[in-house]
Amino acid sequence: MRKCKNKWGNYYILKMDIAKYFDNINKKILLKIIERKIKDKNILWLIKEILYAQKREKGLEIGNYTSQIFANIYLNEIDQYIKHKLKIRYYFRYMDDSILFLQTKRDAIEALKKIKKYLKENLELELNKKTQIFKDKQGVNFCGYKINENRLKIRDKGK
């Protein structure tokens, strides 16, 4: 945040959350993503067994360790899009929660529009209504912390 302040003065924060993320992961899309990186048929067989051992057609079980790995693999697609196609340098994600720091409100609105489109068309995901754009002065709640340019504070549980 300090880098953004030094570079731009005032800036905007785009905070995003994916709606019902684990429930909405498309296993077919996930498998295609994995198949682009892994070519070994035995490993792919094992991955398919793990994925489809869960009886659900769509979505992953939250408590399963492999689900956490698969969920990160799935969202790596949006990571790459944001960093390399949109060229947004200040982007941070933990599972389905992410924050982006952008120079202007217009930049934030435009980025949000493109990200929504990419998520819907490529990953069949939508952003939660909690998604918001706000000025840097407020700081941001992220991963259990209240973060601003001067400090990092553990957030109260009620907030």
List where the protein language model places each region.
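Conserved polymerase palm-domain catalytic core
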Residues: M1-M95, I99-K117, L125-K137
